[in-house]
Design a protein with these regions (language model features):
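Conserved class I S-adenosyl-L-methionine
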Residues: 1-49, 60-64, 84-87, 94, 148-176, ...
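Class I SAM-dependent methyltransferase SAM/SAH-binding core
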Residues: 50-110, 134
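A short SAM/SAH-binding and catalytic strip from SAM-dependent methyltransferases
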Residues: 118-132, 155
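Conserved Class I S-adenosyl-L-methionine
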Residues: 3-10, 20, 24-25, 29-32, ...
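A short glycine-rich, Lys/Arg-flanked "PGG" loop and its adjoining helix->strand segment in the class I
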Residues: 133-148
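A short acidic, Gly/Pro-enriched loop at the edge of an enzyme's catalytic core
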Residues: 108-119
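Conserved hydrophobic residues forming the short capping helix/wall of the S-adenosyl-L-methionine
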Residues: 69, 91-92, 170, 200, ...
Length: 280
């Protein structure tokens, strides 16, 4: 699939699941709060600065930064999906954050002047951009001298049972992924430290730091896991939405036993591993 077609299909899919993201925003955020905190800590927002969040979704990571910027600072919360931007706008209003501007921005063509922001954040979005090299060049262009960018991607599939268990069950029951998940634009396309170092260096960043963070996604039950996971993952939601009840039952017969090793205290805890990168 050509990059333009891939981007348009991604826009359609993520527009479809934006309401589910908004409905579960706090829960999704808490499951990976440590990632958002790492990113904000490494961008080091200060009063009066301007921070840009790309691929922000409903915006929770950026809202952490906004609380450190003070009334004279500014957070630009952005996503290329308009319905996600609308969700972020509502979230900022609910939190009384008057220093947040929500905008539709394509990370590969950032509509901001050169040297115009003090920091850039992106949590779990950069790997989904087919032209990620262009996106990182754009990040470097808009960063002021001395500014920092911090972003997070998912580690390898075997280290992320929170999604691997679902994907494995779907694959065993007829799902064909829309593309190679390790190729540019795929969920696991930036799943190693080396790939992220190469990406940053290719855009001209000299100061690159890469770490791994681990945690767990918590679910009340296999039913809860199925409902939430299939409602917020764009390509998966597409496939599951086309299934009949009997087909869902067949997939669940594969999935539910695979979740048994992750049962904890009456619920489920599925591990995740994230690659976090800070560049300047």
């Amino acid at each position: 699939m050509a990059e333009r077609d891939q981007a348009q299909e991604s826009l359609r899919q993520w527009s479809t699941v934006a309401p589910a993201w908004e409905a579960s925003r706090q829960r999704l955020f808490e499951n990976v709060r440590s990632v958002s905190e790492w990113l904000v800590d490494h961008v080091r927002p200060e009063a009066d600065q301007t921070i840009l969040e790309l691929t922000a979704g409903p915006g929770e990571t950026g809202f952490l930064a906004a609380s450190r910027l003070g009334p004279s600072g500014r957070l630009i919360s952005s996503d290329f999906v308009p319905t996600m931007v609308e969700a972020a706008r509502r979230g900022a209003a609910e939190r009384g954050l008057g220093n947040v501007e929500c905008r539709v921005i394509d990370a590969t063509d950032i509509d901001l002047p050169d040297d115009s922001v003090d920091g850039v954040l992106s949590r779990f979005g950069l790997m989904l951009i087919p032209a990620r090299e262009q996106a990182v060049r754009e990040i470097r262009r808009v960063l002021r001298p001395g500014g920092r960018c911090a972003y997070a991607t998912w580690g390898p599939p075997e280290s992320n049972p929170w999604i691997f268990q679902l994907v494995s069950a779907l694959l065993q029951n007829g799902w064909t992924p829309p593309g190679d998940p390790t190729a540019p634009g795929g969920l696991f396309s930036l799943a190693t430290g080396d790939r992220n170092r190469e990406l940053a260096a290719g855009a001209g960043f000299a100061d690159v730091s890469v770490e791994e963070l681990e945690g767990v996604m918590r679910f009340e039950s296999p039913d809860d896991y199925w409902t939430l996971s299939t409602s917020v993952a764009g390509p998966v939601a597409d496939f599951v939405g086309s299934l009949g009840d009997g087909q869902v039952d067949t997939i669940r017969a594969t999935l539910d036993p695979s979740l048994a090793p992750f049962q904890r205290d009456g619920g489920l805890e599925l591990p995740w591993l994230s690659i976090v990168t800070s560049v300047a």
